[in-house]
């Protein structure tokens, strides 16, 4: 049996009525002020849909609803919340988040549908964790560094699993890390297994809100477990004996407190920074050693590749800029172009 097709006017009225019902339902779903106590300050420990775990000043964690007027709430946000009155009927959670304080920083990741998606707030340090196994990738480190420079959050490079190096291997890795030390980045060499180098890392984390970034298999979770202590063990799967790669088991961003002071937000959203949403000029600015040479190329539209009179390429040839970094710069630009091409094709594919 065929069905009568709605006219455009009828369809508009159906859609309008549907939106009106949604709005009415949302308004009814909000909460009576009389059910909650006096406002208090707190910090979001984790976010789960329309609920958030909020830590109060006394260190207690409260599962809270979120006012529908709050458009964005992520781990690390400092908030005003109100505790639920225990005697009141209909209060199934411990409180409600009323407002969010202005953020000092926000870590985002690109999203194919929404542009960028916030995943953590108020961080002041990104710890880039790499390791000699399964592979020491300077390209991945450089991608993270571009992300840090774009977000204007201070990076700290941590090389894990140094207990697996012999003297010759240690010399080689130190030469690689000198590339970053020479342009002003902090580098720490550690082992979560033997705990070598953990003391300087603890000192670098004290008094800061950090987030650890690293690919699977670099020992990020094991390193966090060693720093946090057994009372705050983060789930970890063994590295596969076949692939040498680890399984990332964190499912939601969560804030933890270090025993020595400082906080860390562990999030699955920062295993690898997506950079495809950035413009090529932002990638160029993300390489700090390029800054002194920008604006000195022969041509204003210089691509810093085979262009004649390129000041950056000349600096590479003179040894002022590491050739590895220059090559990774172009690899990043190439990968961005490929992803944007796939995205544009997907957007136009009906």
Curated annotation (Swiss-Prot):
Limits of the CP-type G domain: 104-273
UniProt binding sites for Zn(2+): 297, 302, 304, 310
One Pfam family named in its UniProt record: RsgA_GTPase
Note on how the cofactor is bound: Binds 1 zinc ion per subunit.
Presence of the UniProt keyword Secreted in the record: no
GO molecular function: GTP binding; GTPase activity; metal ion binding; rRNA binding
Cofactor: Zn(2+)
Binding-site list for GTP: 160-163, 214-222
Principal location listed in the UniProt entry: cytoplasm
Location of region: Disordered: 1-27
SUPFAM superfamilies per UniProt: P-loop containing nucleoside triphosphate hydrolases
One GO cellular component term noted in the UniProt record for this chain: cytoplasm
Enzyme class: hydrolase
Any single GO BP term: ribosomal small subunit biogenesis
Subcellular location(s) per record: Cytoplasm
EC number(s) reported in the record: 3.6.1.-
Biased composition range(s): Polar residues: 1-17
Subunit details: Monomer. Associates with 30S ribosomal subunit, binds 16S rRNA.
Protein name (record): Small ribosomal subunit biogenesis GTPase RsgA
Organism: Salmonella typhimurium (strain LT2 / SGSC1412 / ATCC 700720)
């Amino acid at each position: 049996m065929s069905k009568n097709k709605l006219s455009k006017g009828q369809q508009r009225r159906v859609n309008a009525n549907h939106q009106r019902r949604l709005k009415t339902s949302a308004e009814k779903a909000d909460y009576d002020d009389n059910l909650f106590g006096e406002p208090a300050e707190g910090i979001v420990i984790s976010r789960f849909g329309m609920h958030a775990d909020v830590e109060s000043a006394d260190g207690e964690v409260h599962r809270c609803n979120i006012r529908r007027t709050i458009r964005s709430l992520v781990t690390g946000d400092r908030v005003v919340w109100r505790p639920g009155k225990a005697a009141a009927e209909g209060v199934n959670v411990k409180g409600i988040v009323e407002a969010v304080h202005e953020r000092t920083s926000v870590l985002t990741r690109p999203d194919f549908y929404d542009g960028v998606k916030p995943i953590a707030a108020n961080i002041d340090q990104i710890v880039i964790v790499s390791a000699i196994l399964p592979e020491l990738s300077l390209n991945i480190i450089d991608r993270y560094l571009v992300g840090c420079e774009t977000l204007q959050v201070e990076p700290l490079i941590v090389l894990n699993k140094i207990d697996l190096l012999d003297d010759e291997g240690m010399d080689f890795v130190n030469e690689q890390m000198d590339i970053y030390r020479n342009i002003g980045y902090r580098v720490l060499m550690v082992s979560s297994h033997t705990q070598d180098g953990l003391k300087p890392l603890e000192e670098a984390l004290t008094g800061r809100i950090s987030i650890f970034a690293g690919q699977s298999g670099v020992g990020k979770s094991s390193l966090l477990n060693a720093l946090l202590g057994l009372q705050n063990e983060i789930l970890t799967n063994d590295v596969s004996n076949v692939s040498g790669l680890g399984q990332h088991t964190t499912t939601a961003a969560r804030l933890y407190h270090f025993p020595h002071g400082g906080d860390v937000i562990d999030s699955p959203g920062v295993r690898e920074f997506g950079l495809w949403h950035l413009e090529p000029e932002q990638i160029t600015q993300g390489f700090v050693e390029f800054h002194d040479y920008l604006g000195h190329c022969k041509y204003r539209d210089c691509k810093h590749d085979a262009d004649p009179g390129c000041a950056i390429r000349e600096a590479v040839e003179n040894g002022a800029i590491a050739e590895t970094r220059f090559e990774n710069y172009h690899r990043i630009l190439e990968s961005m172009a490929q992803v944007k091409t796939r995205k544009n094709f997907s957007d136009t594919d009906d």
